[in-house]
Amino acid sequence: MSQHETYRLVGIIRVMNNSVQHRKKDPIKRQEELLKAARIIAGREGIGSLSLNAVAREAGVSKGGLLHHFPSKQELIHALFIQLLEIMDERINIIMVNDSNCYGRFSRAYLHYIGELKESDESFQLALLSLAMPTEPVLRKCWRDWVLGHLEKGDEFDNSYLGALVRYAADGLWLSALTEGQTLSKQECDAIVSRLTQISFEKID
């Protein structure tokens, strides 16, 4: 082998090694691409159409590449739900930081976060996963753990029947708009949210 061919071969090996190292160093980016593909399919066709083959095609990877990150459909759905809960956490924490009154702050932040979701992609994806909970025990546990985690850090109001009332009413308004359409006017919705906000400041008897 000539010296030129040797240098050329060494160069090819270096490029291949760099490519492999780059792929190994970027698993988080690949997972995000796969989750993005899953979100697109869920939003476009519903959670029932979320197959591993469909996600692999949407993301432009092999099924084997997908299975390396998410060995099953359940794990993919679980990861998608966890990601949405992280987004919720971020949004709710921002609302809480900007609320100077610590009493009932979590329930109030939850109310306003849910009230502002409307018909966004985030809202639709969260609704699809929420409606899948009855048949997905892992999702139910994730949601339960998320709520209980916030209630542990919450106060007397958040852990009271009034706190539950505020949060459940927020869920009802949101799911009603998504499943039944807009049956209430904006003024009526605003009035309900305003009244629930007032309740979040009430002292527990």
Locate predicted features.
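Hydrophobic/aromatic-rich alpha-helical bundle segments in the mid-to-C-terminal region
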Residues: 137-144, 148-205
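Helix-turn-helix
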Residues: 41-75
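Short, amphipathic alpha-helix enriched in basic
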Residues: 7-11, 29-54
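Amphipathic alpha-helical segments that line or abut small-molecule/effector binding pockets
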Residues: 36, 100-118, 164, 190, ...
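Hydrophobic alpha-helical connector segments
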Residues: 79, 86-125
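N-terminal intrinsically disordered/low-complexity leader segments
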Residues: 1-29, 205
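Short alpha-helical scaffolding segments that buttress acidic/His motifs in well-ordered protein cores
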Residues: 110-114, 126-131, 166, 170-173
